[in-house]
Structures are given as C-alpha cells and as structure tokens.
A protein has these predicted regions:
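A charge-rich, low-complexity, intrinsically flexible signal that marks solvent-exposed coils, linkers
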Residues: 1-84
C-alpha cells in the first residue's frame, strides 16, 4: 500500500476513533490540512473565533512540512491512537 492509500485509510480510521482531546484533534486537523493543501494561507481568524484561531495556529505550526511528511505523520499518529 502506498503512502496516499495509507493516508486515506487512516482518515477513515480517524473518523471511528473515540473522543479525543482538543490537542489531538488539532494535531490531526493540522496534519490533514498540510497534507492536502500545503502551507496555511491568508490571515488568522479573529481572536473572537476561538476555534478558527486555534485551527489556524495549529496548521501554521506545520509550515514547511511537505505533503508526504504530513501524510506520514498523520498515518503514524492514527496508528498510535488506534494501538492504545
């Protein structure tokens, strides 16, 4: 199975995970966005949009990570979450 197939399988697995911490959800979100869209673009949402600002900040931490690196990190994270 190539990396793209592993990534797609991990996305499906992640949807079936039990409830996760906000930190873990932001990590999954940021890796997914970096893998599928690349570096974050545009301005951060208003500080009053706490959820949007947190998502933007999490994605920003992945700046410079290649699509393949982000996919692999996502696959690894989902594997850790489903193993335990």
């Amino acid at each position: 199975m190539d990396l793209t197939e592993q990534f797609e399988a991990s996305i499906a697995k992640a949807k079936g995970l039990p409830s996760q911490s906000n930190e873990t959800l932001l990590e999954l979100y940021s890796l997914y966005k970096q893998a599928t869209e690349g570096d974050v673009r545009g301005e951060a949402p208003s500080g009053f949009d706490f959820r949007g600002a947190a998502k933007h900040a999490a994605w920003e931490t992945r700046r410079g990570l290649s699509s393949d690196e982000a996919m692999q990190a996502y696959v690894d994270l989902v594997e850790r979450l489903t193993a335990g």
